[in-house]
Curated annotation (Swiss-Prot):
SUPFAM superfamilies linked: P-loop containing nucleoside triphosphate hydrolases
Gene it is expressed from: abo2
Compositional bias annotation for Basic residues: 212-221
GO MF, one annotated term: ATP hydrolysis activity
Protein name: ATPase with bromodomain protein abo2
Cell compartments where the protein resides: Nucleus
EC number(s) per entry: 3.6.1.-
UniProt source species: Schizosaccharomyces pombe (strain 972 / ATCC 24843)
Residue ranges of the region described as Disordered: 1-223, 305-324
Role: Probable ATPase which may play a role in nucleosome organization.
Polar residues compositional bias, start-end: 66-89
InterPro entries tied to this protein: AAA+_ATPase, AAA_lid_3, ATAD2-like, ATPase_AAA_core, ATPase_AAA_CS, P-loop_NTPase
Family affiliation: Belongs to the AAA ATPase family.
Transmembrane segments: none
Effect of loss of the gene: Double knockout with abo1 results in lethality.
Length: 1201
């Protein structure tokens, strides 16, 4: 309606009237109280005030003609209301008090011939009240078809017609192109079918609508109602349509004297009495998200609602607003709703297999995805195969026996012991050729959601999908985050998730052939309901690897190292890495390999460019493992397990005898040396023999009675060192530490609860050891109630249970308190008093230190300043060398096509140049005028050297008088280069053409010079026209690849040549060394005589050992090496003397260190180590020995010994 008012207002030429109309329009617009983005509005105004403003307009509109019905009526203009609440029923009605008594036929003619402001939507006619029969018809209180505010609520249109006019209006104003009785097809096509009734409905109503006369109706619509064309209603185009659409057609606007009156009436009562319109409901069914995109999400699109029903959008506004809302709804909610309601078969749910693992991990290979790649867990692998593979592959066995197979297993243990690795290998190897097993890998956080009920729904869908594709395996990593212990302090959301998981694992509905595996580092934090048969039937404990397991893990991770690491060093490394987990050992091997790369190619760490490196030069040595062991931090430092911190090798040598004695006692008390036959060997026995063997084996559980061991250290003989080294010697025994610092370290946990937890873990993992250090200080540090609780827990252990109490005391047994002595009764406990290391132990202790002097000197500065070889850089285009052979062949084939294309185009250009510029077919300078050196075969006879103006200088020809250099380029040479593949780009072709031009310029011939420039210009022009940008770019890439390929090929040839020469030199040295040993069979020749032997004879001699003239063998006398041999002999003599001197020093130190205190030995040991380090660059080893002896005796003086 705003557009109609604006268009009518702009049609006037009077500025004063325009200002009045603007005032009215602004007032009417400012009174709109509600947003009209979805509904139609009506503006109210005061008729009296408007009457005063538009007096001039009403006075000029007196020549209008009204319909006969309007002339007959003397009352106010009747109101015509059209409701769009139900388009299927007639909604046109007149006010009965305002209707005349004209016949229905006249009314129908008025409807068909006239027009109103209502746009018929979905039909083929429009009514317009602005077009009247005569331009001289006067309006009294005329109003426009603006809508009242009540229509915003009822979605109806109200129209009113002018009051009865005067009879002085008889003139007709006709449009030139107007045909009476014919509606405008353009307006008929642009209809809004969703908001208006059909014209047939209007024919049933007595309506005094004037016939259409006057100006052509302009196609308009309301400011809110969208134009929705009904494709089913189409009429033939009017014959005047084309003329009206022509640019020469000019609309006939209304003049100033026939402008309408914009006076409006209040139709609030009429609109309020009309029925409420029905709601138009629009349901959006957006297309579903492609499942290929959905599969990449963690577990599907997180829904924004809690319901599983499809979201629907409703709108009571226009269709245009609904379209926008529908689009936003699809972006925000529609896709989510479709994904929620998608079938479970289309969801991803973390389904992985060997192919998925390889696609996500580019470094994964077949060997890394095999059970053989897991070391030290052979027993667990066997049980896992029995539990997982047997029910899935052979379900008929359990059906025959009417038993339920175990369908749940829990992995628990310290971090880095192979729990997740086991799941990855199981996912890659669980399926066979005959049986496909699905594997679902989920993490605890994947199933959680901020929406209430969403996590439970995801779990339900996961189990439904696993049941659908059974047999299947579901692996929950870090399951303690998904199913923690339910308590009153916990949120109800987590309790609901745990309850849902419990019901899904073992509820009323069976889950079929679905095996559930959980992994956690904290099994005690899991809900107890999960840890029962039916849910998690078995629990596999992944311990820290023992010595044999560490050896196996190191062998697996260093299998591809070159050269192969010696087995003796791997054994030593396995002994020194006590307390390392599988992940720590793998990180150790990785760090050693990276250190080898850093040592071999330090250039790659100082530049961002890529270099050409030879991978065969990388060699991992023992020194790389030594450096790597200093960088690796062990991750298995847990509060409930005593860390296995190894001591130095020198202290192991010092306490070797004491360690052996204590270890033997522990094994004897816990009966660790008792051999039991394996299960495989027992299965082969008959039933009776098996029962007898079982009865004998049961004796082991009754052989140990409350094992106790107390180790006392009166004079500080090294109790602290022994407490560290013992656990590295007792691999496979679970150790719980009751150290004072560990009991008091955690402020959030009371010592009593920690004490209860330690005893519980020790009894669960029997045979085990409860270790107490500084046991003599417990009565003074802890309260009586705590000590009583400790004694109560100690007595609660079964007498025959293999749980040992091991105590270390820094005093003798008599000085211990009665409380501590009660823990170690004399009749059932073992005692061991530590003694000071004897002479042999002290000698080995000091000799181990002094041996390091023989490794000196170390030139640290020279090593840092050593020169680094320069590596060749890899060109950016050399990535093709890294491609596979198949891709590389395809690339070379495409490059050949591009080169053929450029050759054909350049050959056409060259043919044109040859036909037009024949002077450049041969070189500019005649070959007979060039002097050639006499050593060459081509010598021009009959002329002296001074008679030649040009002479040959390398690859160019030089003129004698001015030393001008000619390239001697010509078309024949260019053609030869073209078809030999020398030109990869047009630039190279133009470069040779330019050489011809340069030679012509140097020749001095003006005509030849101009022709050469013209020829070069033609060549450039033809190259630009025939070769497009894409082909030019492809040619440049081909040229780069060709250069990189040639460089790589040349490098390989050089490397092969160097390797061949090195191998020949080695063969020659080997031949000479082997033959010189048999001097009787050789005729010795000096080095000068050997040089005179011909190459063939010398080569034949080297390979066959025979000369061409002698039948005896020929050998080459090596040069004199008397000086070198003398130095080596002196060095060997010095080493022997140094070793003897060091042994004497060790004996001397062992004799003078009978201190009865290990702490004093450590003091002397540290002083000697400092002295050796300070002299690390000294060449005179005897001087270092003298300084060490002086330091030793000075330390004894400082201690007062």
């Amino acid at each position: 309606m705003r557009r109609r008012a604006r268009s009518i207002r702009f049609s006037s030429d009077d500025n004063e009237d325009n200002e009045e109309d603007d005032d009215y329009y602004s007032n009417a617009h400012s009174e709109k109280s509600e947003d009209h983005s979805n509904h139609i509005k009506v503006s109210h105004f005061d008729p009296s005030s408007y009457k005063q403003k538009l007096v001039s307009v009403r006075e000029t509109q007196r020549n209008r003609k009204f319909s006969s019905l309007q002339k007959h009526l003397n009352t106010e203009t009747p109101s015509f209301s059209v409701s769009i609440e139900n388009p299927s029923k007639p909604s046109a009605a007149f006010n009965d008090a305002s209707l005349g008594k004209k016949s229905t036929e006249h009314q129908i003619d008025g409807i068909r011939n006239g027009s109103s402001n209502l746009q018929m939507e979905g039909n083929d006619k429009e009514l317009d009240t602005d077009n009247n029969e005569d331009e001289s018809t006067t309006f009294k209180d005329e109003e426009d078809d603006l809508i009242s505010p009540k229509s915003y609520l009822t979605s109806s249109k109200t129209f009113s017609y002018p009051k009865a006019p005067t009879e002085s209006t008889n003139g007709d104003y006709l449009d030139e192109d107007y045909v009476d009785g014919q509606s405008d097809p353009e307006s008929s096509n642009a209809s809004d079918s969703d908001f208006a009734d059909s014209p047939d409905d209007l024919t049933k109503v007595r309506s005094p609508i004037p016939s259409r006369r006057g100006r052509r109706k302009r196609k308009m619509r309301g400011p809110i109602l969208p134009v929705k064309k009904n494709l089913r209603v189409k009429k033939a185009m009017s014959p005047l349509r084309a003329e009206r659409n022509s640019p020469d057609f000019r609309r006939k606007l209304r003049s100033r004297d026939n402008r309408p009156n914009y006076h409006l009436f209040d139709y609030y009562n009429e609109i309020a009495s009309s029925p409420n319109p029905s709601t138009t409901k629009i349901t959006y069914n957006p297309p579903k998200l492609p499942m290929k995109d959905f599969a990449t999400l963690p577990i599907g699109y997180q829904s924004t609602c809690d319901s599983d029903e499809t979201s629907e959008l409703s709108s009571t506004s226009s269709e245009q607003t609904s379209d926008v809302e529908g689009l936003n709804a699809y972006n925000n909610l529609g896709a989510s709703s479709d994904i929620e309601n998608a079938p479970s078969s289309q969801l991803h749910f973390g389904h992985i297999d060997e192919k998925t693992i390889r696609s996500t991990d580019p470094f994964a290979n077949r060997e890394n995805l095999d059970f053989n790649s897991i070391g030290g867990l052979e027993d667990i692998i066997l049980q896992l195969k029995e539990m997982v593979m047997l029910p899935l592959l052979y379900p008929e066995v359990f059906l025959h026996l009417h038993i339920t197979p175990p369908r749940g297993v829990l992995f628990h243990g310290p971090p880095g012991t192979g729990k997740t690795l086991m799941a990855r290998v199981l996912a890659a190897n669980c399926s066979t050729k005959n049986q496909k097993i699905s594997f679902f890998l989920r993490k605890g956080s994947d199933c959680l959601s901020k929406w209430v009920g969403e996590a439970e729904r995801q779990l339900r869908l996961l189990f439904e999908e696993a049941r659908r594709v059974q047999p299947s395996i579901i692996f929950f990593d870090e399951i303690d985050g998904l199913a923690p212990i339910r308590s009153s302090k916990q949120e109800q959301t987590h309790s609901s998730i745990v309850s849902t998981l419990l019901a899904l694992m073992d509820g009323l509905d069976t889950r079929g052939q679905v095996v559930v595996i959980g992994a956690t580092n904290r099994p005690n934090d899991l809900d107890p309901a999960l840890r029962r048969p039916g849910r998690f039937d078995r629990e596999f404990y992944f311990p820290l690897p023992n010595k044999q397991a560490r050896m196996k893990i190191l062998e697996i991770n260093s299998l591809h190292f070159s050269p192969k690491i010696p087995e003796s060093y791997l054994l030593h490394l396995a002994e020194s890495t006590s307390g390392y987990g599988g992940a720590d050992l793998k990180a150790l091997c990785t760090e050693a390999a990276l250190n080898a790369v850093r040592r071999t190619f330090p250039q790659i760490y100082t530049s961002s460019d890529k270099f050409l490196i030879d991978l065969n030069e990388i060699s991992v040595s023992i020194c790389d493992f030594v450096v790597a062991s200093e960088k690796i931090a062990v991750s298995t430092r847990r509060s409930d397990v005593k860390p296995n911190i190894p001591i130095t090798d020198s202290h192991k040598i010092l306490f070797k005898k004491s360690i052996e004695v204590i270890t033997s006692k522990i094994r004897r008390l816990l009966k660790l040396d008792v051999y039991l036959p394996t299960v495989e060997s027992l299965q082969k026995l008959p039933a009776e023999e098996l029962m007898r063997q079982k009865e004998i084996n049961s004796l082991k559980t009754t052989m140990s009675f409350r094992p106790r061991l107390l180790i006392t250290d009166i004079y500080g003989y090294g109790c602290t060192y022994l407490s560290k080294v013992l656990f590295s010697m007792l691999d496979g025994i679970h150790v719980q530490s009751l150290d004072i610092s560990e009991l008091l370290m955690d402020t959030t946990t009371s010592p009593r609860s920690l004490l209860t937890k330690i005893f519980s873990e020790a009894r669960k993992n029997a045979p085990s050891i409860i270790f107490i250090n500084n046991v003599e200080k417990w009565p003074s540090l802890f309260s009586h109630s705590f000590l009583s609780m400790f004694l109560l827990l100690l007595d609660s252990i079964s007498p025959l249970e293999p749980v040992m109490l091991l105590g270390f005391a820094n005093t003798n047994q008599e000085k211990l308190s009665s409380t501590v002595r009660s823990w170690f009764p004399s009749h059932r406990s073992e005692y061991h008093d530590l003694s000071f290391p004897d002479y042999s132990s002290r000698y080995s202790f000091f000799h181990y230190l002094l041996k390091r002097i023989s490794f000196l000197p170390i030139h640290q500065k020279s090593a840092e300043a050593a020169s680094v070889d320069i590596l060749p850089k890899v060109l950016p285009v050399s990535k093709t060398s890294d491609l596979t052979d198949k891709v590389n062949r395809r690339q070379r084939k495409n490059d050949k096509k591009i080169k053929n294309k450029i050759q054909v185009k350049l050959s056409s250009i060259l043919e044109m140049l040859r036909s037009r510029y024949k002077k450049f077919k041969k070189p500019i300078i005649d070959l007979n005028d060039i002097y050639i050196d006499e050593s060459n075969e081509r010598v021009v006879k009959g002329k002296s050297k001074d008679n030649f103006e040009y002479f040959l200088s390398g690859n160019t020809v030089t003129r004698k008088k001015d030393n001008a250099c000619f390239k001697m380029m010509n078309f024949e040479e260019i053609e030869r280069r073209l078809w030999s593949g020398r030109y990869c780009t047009p630039k190279e072709f133009l470069r040779d053409i330019k050489m011809i031009k340069q030679d012509a310029i140097l020749s001095g011939d003006v005509n030849l010079k101009h022709k050469a420039k013209e020829m070069f210009a033609h060549a450039e022009l033809n190259v630009d026209e025939l070769i497009d940008a894409k082909l030019l770019y492809d040619c440049c890439q081909v040229s780069k690849r060709e250069k990189a390929y040639k460089q790589l090929k040349q490098k390989k040839l050089n490397n092969a040549k160097d390797a061949h020469e090195m191998q020949e030199s080695k063969n020659e040295e080997t031949f000479v060394r082997n033959d010189v040993a048999q001097e009787d069979n050789f005729i010795e020749l000096s080095s000068n005589e050997v040089r005179n032997v011909s190459n063939d004879e010398h080569k034949h001699t080297l390979f066959h050992g025979q000369s061409l003239t002698h039948n005896n063998l020929i050998a080459v006398t090596p040069p004199s090496r008397t000086g070198v041999e003398h130095k080596e002999e002196n060095k060997k003599y010095d080493n022997v003397n140094i070793q003897k001197t060091l042994a004497k020093c060790a004996e001397e130190f062992a004799e003078h260190t009978n201190f009865n205190k290990v702490e004093l030995l450590d003091f002397v040991y540290s002083k000697l180590s400092s002295t050796i380090w300070e002299n690390r660059e000294e060449h005179d080893l005897l001087k270092i020995v003298r300084d060490v002896r002086q330091t030793f005796f000075r330390s004894l003086e400082d201690m007062g010994v």
